[in-house]
């Protein structure tokens, strides 16, 4: 892949032309360690708590990641207790996730090809005149996420109330496929939206905040998933997740509508 980071490109150009590189003076080890901690730990946490875009994107991505781990634990238990599936048959129930994942990435590619790229070419055509240099709004990344915000709760509620002995076992597997489809439709676009918003430098810190939050929630979710499903039953335990997804469904739509205002108020200037 071609290098796209501006500072690296500038350094390469300067080196080819024999120009002096604008490098920082040698730092002591202690200052280098402090700078490393600041950029890899302090900044991501600061962005997580002070930047609305980072905070809500981390909330969305953490929920999607945690949802995957929850189903890894809850799905085998559900099909064992409801349908009497053996250990080997329980593994086959994840075929819904495989199918849903395949269709989800196909939809993301289609959304990029027929929506995002079309909007990008239209924007470049309209702003190609001299003096009209303007950044392409990253909100156009959110089309698939807005679709996924409607599909995810539907899949969760469908799984919640079709995972019953009287209903054929294929139906909840289809519900799982719909759930993972909607989840990936949210996860990938909002992550790309956040990186596009902050650029390569601060986008890396924002991605670090996302990693911190989603792995923390994923680890915690494993501690209560089985107990929650045993106490509430598959119907109400999954419905609880559905209500959480329904509560977070407006977030991509809010970003699409008010994202420019939030970006304008950001304390972190985007680096190209």
Predicted regions and their residues:
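Short acidic/histidine-centered micro-motifs embedded in hydrophobic/aromatic stretches
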Residues: 51, 61-62, 209
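Primarily residues marking transmembrane-helix entry/exit sites
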Residues: 50, 54-58, 166-170
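Central mid-sequence intracellular linker of multi-pass
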Residues: 1-55, 105-126, 254-272
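Short coil/turn segments at secondary-structure boundaries
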Residues: 11-12, 59-60, 172, 251-252
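A single, central transmembrane helix in multi-pass transporters
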Residues: 56-62, 66
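C-terminal transmembrane bundle
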Residues: 65, 69-70, 76-272
């Amino acid at each position: 892949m071609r290098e796209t980071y501006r500072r690296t490109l500038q350094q390469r150009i300067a080196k080819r032309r024999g120009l002096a590189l604008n490098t920082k003076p040698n730092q002591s080890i202690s200052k280098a360690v402090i700078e490393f901690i600041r950029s890899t730990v302090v900044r991501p946490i600061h962005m997580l708590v002070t930047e609305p875009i980072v905070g809500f994107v981390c909330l969305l991505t953490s929920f999607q990641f945690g949802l995957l781990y929850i189903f890894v634990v809850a799905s085998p238990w559900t099909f064992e207790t409801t349908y009497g599936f053996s250990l080997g048959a329980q593994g086959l129930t994840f075929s819904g996730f495989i199918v849903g994942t395949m269709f989800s990435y196909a939809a993301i590619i289609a959304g990029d090809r027929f929506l995002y790229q079309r909007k990008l070419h239209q924007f470049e055509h309209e702003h190609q005149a001299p003096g009209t240099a303007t950044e392409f709004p990253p909100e156009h990344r959110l089309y698939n996420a807005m679709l996924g915000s409607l599909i995810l709760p539907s899949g969760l509620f469908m799984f919640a109330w079709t995972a019953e002995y009287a209903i054929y076992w294929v139906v909840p597997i289809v519900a799982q496929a719909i759930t993972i489809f909607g989840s990936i439709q949210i996860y990938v676009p909002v992550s790309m939206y956040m990186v596009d918003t902050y650029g390569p430098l601060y986008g890396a810190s924002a991605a670090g905040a996302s990693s911190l939050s989603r792995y923390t929630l994923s680890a915690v979710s494993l501690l209560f998933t089985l107990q929650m499903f045993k106490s509430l039953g598959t119907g109400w335990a999954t419905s609880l997740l559905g209500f959480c997804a329904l509560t977070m469904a407006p977030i991509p739509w809010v970003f699409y509508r008010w994202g420019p205002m939030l970006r304008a108020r950001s304390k972190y200037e985007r680096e190209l």
